[in-house]
Amino acid sequence: MLLHETESEYDSKSKKNNYSYYESSDFKPLIEKYNRIKYSVTEYIYLLTVKNVVLFPDVVIPITAVKQKSINLFKSAYYTYKKIGILTKKYFNTTFSIAKLNIQTFNIYSFNKFNKINKFNKINKFNKINKFNKINKFNKINKFNKTNNIYYIGTVAKILKLLIMPDGNTTVILQGISRFKIIKLIQVYPYFKAEIIYLKDEKPQKKDKEYLILIDSIKEIAIKIIQDNYKIPSESSFAISNIESKSFLINFVAYNLNIEIKNKQILLEYDFLKQRAIETFRFLNIEYEKIKLKNDIQYRVRYDIDQQQKEYFLNQQIKALQEELGDFSYEKEVEVLRIKSYKKNWSKEAQNQFDRELSKLKRTNPQMPEYTILRNYLDLMLDLPWKKYSQDNYDLYRAQKILDKDHFGIDKVKERIIEYLSVLKLKGDLRSPILCFYGPPGVGKTSLGRSIASALNRKYVRISLGGLNDEAEIRGHRKTYIGAMPGRVLQSIKKAGTSNPVFVLDEIDKMGLGSQGNPSSAMLEVLDPEQNKEFYDNFLEMGYDLSKVIFIATANSLYTINIALLDRMEIIDMNGYTVEEKIEISKKHLIPKQLKENGLKSKDIILGVKQIEKIIESYTRESGVRSLEKNISKIVRYAAKNIAMNKKYLKRINMSKIEEVLGPPNDPEKYELIQVPGVVTGLAWTIVGGEIIYIESTLLKGRGNLSITGNVGEVMKESATIAFKYIKAHNYEFGIDEKMFELYNIHIHAPEGGIHKDGPSAGITMLTSIISSFLKKKIRPYLAMTGEITLRGKVLPVGGIKEKILAAKRANIKEIILSKANKKDIDDIKKVYLKGLKFHFVSKMNEVIDLSIIK
């Protein structure tokens, strides 16, 4: 075969024909149909892998070869009229690189003169690759079949023209003929040769209207892209318009799409022309939208620049006219600001600062951004209530009445507030600690701040700190930033209009640490009485006196509050309400409030005590009253709807009507009488109040290992480990055979795995559960416990006792085991809340086991 001619044979033929640079006859026709293609039989052809291009049937492309091996392949195929299989590489670092593609796009019908082909020259020579020279016959062919570096579907092409350049490189003009797929590689040296099968393009029926419309749409949008993209020669639109072959139009447009190579390969691999046309049209639409967006952005940018220039020239003209007329409107504004400053009762330092900034404003062009910032700064200084205070009302009896009217229960909290106001009345300053109301949601922490403001006859302001993670929100931004503004503290003082409001810092436990600083640290200056007399705001750039402000903070959790910040506050616990308290709150506050908000009168709907209790027990699960208020609101809206529609309705709400309006009741939180060894009832605290929790344990054959499940935290895992180690160390005291630890594993589980559980208060509960499992003895019914344990077997006190007791009452618990150190917490609780409960105060685990396990 001529493909195996040597290089010398090529050179002899070159000399015989007397050529070194081909300028011979015209090209062969660019689109030439091959009727001799047989799709049912295989054929053997040589392969050429290229990168960054996918060749489609009928499309013409140029390729420049720099390797002698590639040049020989091109010459051999050209003189024997043999076809070449063009395959695309997936990765640029593949070892099968044979030729380098020239990116220049060729015209469909004609080629430029060859004196411009120098663009393809000057390609750096590649390092010689000896991998393929050392391949012995076909022993490495399987590597080609297994590689993922090339696509196995490509296009068979013929060489239309071969051009030898003066520098020795060779450029060929290829035209795609038909798609093919590799069946098997049969030769590696000197060129890749494979057995292939042709892939036929399945054309739709001639009367397929959808296909015809699709072709017209492709042509139309392709022309639009050419017209809107200044980088594409306008003559290309005429070429697109004159294409008659539908398949050639699809392939030509697909080849020229500005998309990734893998997407072009997907288009090539479609067997159905209609599907290829659909996907090509989709990519065309994406490209068209990108071009439109790009052009639109460029237009807007040019328009904005023109507008700015126009406004600048107009402003200069206006300024010149004003100078001629002697009328400067902004100078009048400056004078108005100066007159206002004379009326302010501020310090000499503040007056000097104002005068300096006012002088800057006078020298600044009103069209400059700095003018707006300076104006905002001066407005802030004038709007702040410098040394302006509201007159306090220290009538403590009046304050007590307001607190009792607005809040039912929480007597200890109200007593502490009265003490706070008493000190304020006698001493005249606020050097006492900042009050922080701590408790579950819905117990009235925020509303207490409003009541204090009302009692003292002071202004009330509130800022929510939840999610705040930027220090500038507290201290403000520096004036050098565009859009700078003061911090939320000074903004609230400005809004209050006095320098001594009651300032509620809501959700102080939910401040976060962000990349812009730590707002908790900035809050230290706000709350520290030694520092807030000269509170420095970055925007104000001078100190402002906050010492007369009554700051009140609220929090649901103390664990997330900065320790230094926590040290500056006095924590006042606001525990949850009992059922009786919730009923009274509903009658005195929630129901009248909802009737007023929904435009009803007290006679329009009647809710009895039993009905309110039903709502509390079956439709709420909280320490506060927020969810209770929502359910009462639903019932009030039921009445409002019927009144508005002139329908008859039941004014006195009964139990069945509650279920009709609120839906099926929730399962009440009641104690489950589970007489099974290893199951113990504990008491837990959550941010919404107290709950009962079951601890389960069981023995499994094993080697004495401990495991715990139920979405528990590290502290709870440590408590389980301490309990297990204590039992192993004191097994004879509890009557447990030592061999049991060698034969069995113990598994502890805390039900409701979707809820995270942590803390030390389940220590005695887990220890009791493990001993119950080893002894196979049941726990006394209606008994619950809470407490921390140590390795010495001591029972330590825990927190949240009131919430836990309320949860025990709701669950119908009769007896509770607590640490002796928690007895003081029981003494602080009203006797009415303890009715029906029996308490056992213990100091050691032996006492817990004696009280809990049935003998």
From Swiss-Prot:
Enzyme class: hydrolase
Keywords: ATP-binding, Cytoplasm, Hydrolase, Nucleotide-binding, Protease, Serine protease, Stress response
Upregulation: By heat shock.
Catalytic-site annotation from UniProt: 761, 804
Domain Lon proteolytic: 674-855
Gene behind the chain: lon
Similarity comment: Belongs to the peptidase S16 family.
Domain of life: Bacteria
Localization, UniProt: Cytoplasm
GO biological process: cellular response to heat; protein quality control for misfolded or incompletely synthesized proteins
Record GO cellular component, one term: cytoplasm
Matches recorded under Pfam families: AAA (PF00004), Lon_C (PF05362), Lon_lid (PF22667), LON_substr_bdg (PF02190)
Cross-referenced CDD domains: RecA-like_Lon
Oligomeric form and interacting partners: Homohexamer. Organized in a ring with a central cavity.
EC number(s) stated in the UniProt entry for this protein: 3.4.21.53
Positions of the Lon N-terminal domain: 45-288
Record's protein name: Lon protease
Major localisation: cytoplasm
A GO molecular function held by the record: serine-type endopeptidase activity
Annotated binding of ATP, by residue: 439-446
Role of this protein: ATP-dependent serine protease that mediates the selective degradation of mutant and abnormal proteins as well as certain short-lived regulatory proteins. Required for cellular homeostasis and for survival from DNA damage and developmental changes induced by stress. Degrades polypeptides processively to yield small peptide fragments that are 5 to 10 amino acids long. Binds to DNA in a double-stranded, site-specific manner.
Catalytic activity reported: Hydrolysis of proteins in presence of ATP
